[in-house]
């Protein structure tokens, strides 16, 4: 089934809740970057977290970039997201696999590391982008997104992100939730929610059991009134193109372009975000060089 995200209001606005099935999104990222298990889980969780952040914080054409660097074995993780729920992302070391942790699960904390920062840069089309940064408090990423929302956005929240990776490195399921506590929420309602989150299995386990985002919402808010505000398709989508890379090539020194023509007889550009390769022939490079010199 195609990935989708559900936005909802709980009890007339005590909470805003977002639940997403992002299985195909994370599976596509795994295939594009050939990630191994620990890298798949780390990148997947960051993709899901970014999707939840961008669909809850942004509107219109606004976009954001999440960077996670805990100086762990997977290196830096970079994910772009927008209000429409599409994401793209990559990490530094895709071929990272680690022994399972004491709970017999992928050791995301060790893969990501905790000696570093989570940085969110929001481009709201107002000129200078806004950047918020917090230290990594967990490395498991759900808690780190929660900490970011509390400290940088002043929104008390709960974030859960999880990915189930099969022994052959493919993604079986992936998903997550984000719950924002609104000013009208009672202490009793907050305590009840905290207890439910504590008792609830990971989202990936619920998806494995065939639960939908709507059913996961109902598990989180058993007694409360749920109003579904929007059900939106989400996915992995990259906006790279050969033209964009041609523009980048046009900005480098003419001598360097001439060298590519004379010595390499062409060039290959690879998109970090999606792995797509673009070939530029000698004629392509000559045309770019001629155009650049004419400016």
From Swiss-Prot:
The keyword Chaperone is annotated on this UniProt entry: yes
Keywords linked to the UniProt accession: Chaperone, Cytoplasm, Disulfide bond, Redox-active center, Zinc
GO molecular function: protein folding chaperone; unfolded protein binding
Gene3D superfamilies (alphabetical): Hsp33 domain (3.55.30.10), HSP33 redox switch-like (3.90.1280.10)
Subcellular location: Cytoplasm
Taxon lineage: Bacteria, Bacillati, Bacillota, Bacilli, Lactobacillales
GO CC field: cytoplasm
Disulfide bond positions: 238-240, 271-274
Domain of life: Bacteria
GO BP field: protein refolding
Alphabetized NCBIfam families for the sequence: PRK00114.1 (NF001033)
Name of a matching Pfam family: HSP33
SUPFAM superfamilies: Hsp33 domain, HSP33 redox switch-like
Purpose of the protein: Redox regulated molecular chaperone. Protects both thermally unfolding and oxidatively damaged proteins from irreversible aggregation. Plays an important role in the bacterial defense system toward oxidative stress.
Protein family per UniProt: Belongs to the HSP33 family.
Name of the featured protein: 33 kDa chaperonin
């Amino acid at each position: 089934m195609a990935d989708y995200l559900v936005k909802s209001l709980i009890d007339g606005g005590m909470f805003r809740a977002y639940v997403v099935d992002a299985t195909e999104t994370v599976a596509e990222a795994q295939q594009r970057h050939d990630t191994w298990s620990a890298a798949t889980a780390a990148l997947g969780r960051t993709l899901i977290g970014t999707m939840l952040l961008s669909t809850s914080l942004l509107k219109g054409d606004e976009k954001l970039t999440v960077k996670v660097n805990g100086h762990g074995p997977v290196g830096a993780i970079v994910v772009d997201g927008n209000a429409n729920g599409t994401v793209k992302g990559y990490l530094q070391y895709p071929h990272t696999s680690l022994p399972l942790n004491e709970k017999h699960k992928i050791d995301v904390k060790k893969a990501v590391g905790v000696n570093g920062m989570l940085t969110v840069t929001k481009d709201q089309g107002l000129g200078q982008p806004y950047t918020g940064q917090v230290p990594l408090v967990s490395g498991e990423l759900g808690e780190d997104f929660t900490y970011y929302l509390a400290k940088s956005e002043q929104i008390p929240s709960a974030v859960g992100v999880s990915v189930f990776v099969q022994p052959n490195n493919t993604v079986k399921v992936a998903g997550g939730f984000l719950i924002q506590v609104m000013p009208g929420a009672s202490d009793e309602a907050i305590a009840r929610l905290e207890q439910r989150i504590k008792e609830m299995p990971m989202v990936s386990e619920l998806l494995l059991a065939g639960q939908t985002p709507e059913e996961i919402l109902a598990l989180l808010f058993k007694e409360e009134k749920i109003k579904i505000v929007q059900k939106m398709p989400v996915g992995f989508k990259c906006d790279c193109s050969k033209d964009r890379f041609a523009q980048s090539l046009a900005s480098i020194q003419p001598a360097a372009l001439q060298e590519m023509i004379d010595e390499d007889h062409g060039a290959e550009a690879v998109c970090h975000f999606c792995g797509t390769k673009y070939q530029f022939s000698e004629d392509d490079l000559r045309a770019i060089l001629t155009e650049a010199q004419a400016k």
